């Protein structure tokens, strides 16, 4: 088990996750990251999420992987 953090950013803003989550492995971290991106993109707001990225880091601050929000949004119609 390891503590991972899910920071999100775009070209203008960075939001740091100070709480994080404990996960068993990278697959669980990926699933959690996917749920977070879905949560943010599904909320009713005026935010354009297309240039946002979720950065997943371990407790040492090393980036494990990134999830561009566009992966979850799909192609615009």
What are these regions (language model features)?
Residues 25-41:
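A short, charged, amphipathic alpha-helix used as a generic interaction element across diverse proteins
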Residues 45-77:
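C-terminal structural segments of small proteins and small subunits
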Residues 2, 19, 50-52:
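A generic structural signal for short beta-strands and their flanking turns/coil linkers
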Residues 1, 40-47:
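Short linear motifs in intrinsically disordered
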Residues 1-16:
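Short aromatic-glycine-(Arg/Gly/Cys) micro-motifs in beta-strand/loop hairpins
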Residues 20, 37-38, 71:
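Residues in and immediately flanking transmembrane alpha helices
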Residues 1-2, 24-30, 58-62:
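A short, structured loop/turn motif at beta-sheet edges
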Residues 15-24:
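A short, exposed loop/beta-hairpin motif centered on an aromatic-Gly-Thr core
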